């Protein structure tokens, strides 16, 4: 589980599923399955937010010919503060989902052999609900932004990150 600080939930759930098999818990209760799935969705959201907004967005928002001093997350914050802010908030939302389902934002212990060690309380669920639609809208907005960027210069993206090896 402590192999990675970006995707510890994936490692945690893989370990829990391995132990499930060892102890003969081939089926876990439906609620536990949903909590584990929600935990993993939180992981996916926060991990993808880090990847896109902090690591990849400079390449999509600025040309490759842009200076390295500008084509980075600081440049995104300067030129596209709303996009940068959304990335931070999307990641935080994903981490809150993890915290509520796994006990901590990083290296949680929510999945145990045969299920999970707690359910999501009504108060915890209600904590997540108000921002859910906004988070989904921001995700859709990024897809629109990528589509616009691609359509403006498909050749740029056709060979993006491809390296001829022989």
Per-region residue spans from a language model:
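Active-site bordering "gate/hinge" segments
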Residues: 1-166
């Amino acid at each position: 589980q402590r192999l990675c600080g970006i995707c510890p939930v994936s490692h945690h759930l893989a370990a829990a599923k391995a132990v499930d098999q060892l102890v003969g818990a081939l089926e876990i209760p439906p609620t536990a399955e949903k909590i584990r799935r929600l935990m993993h969705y939180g992981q996916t959201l926060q991990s993808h937010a880090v990847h896109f907004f902090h690591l990849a967005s400079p390449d999509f928002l600025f040309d490759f010919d842009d200076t390295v001093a500008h084509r980075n997350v600081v440049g995104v914050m300067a030129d596209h503060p709303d996009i940068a802010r959304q990335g931070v908030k999307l990641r935080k939302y994903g981490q809150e989902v993890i915290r509520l389902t796994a006990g901590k934002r990083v290296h949680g212990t929510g999945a145990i052999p045969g299920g999970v060690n707690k359910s999501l309380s009504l108060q915890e669920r209600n904590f997540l609900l108000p921002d859910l639609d906004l988070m989904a809208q921001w995700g859709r907005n990024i897809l629109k932004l990528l589509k616009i960027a691609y359509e403006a210069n498909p050749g740029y993206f056709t060979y993006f990150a491809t390296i001829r090896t022989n």
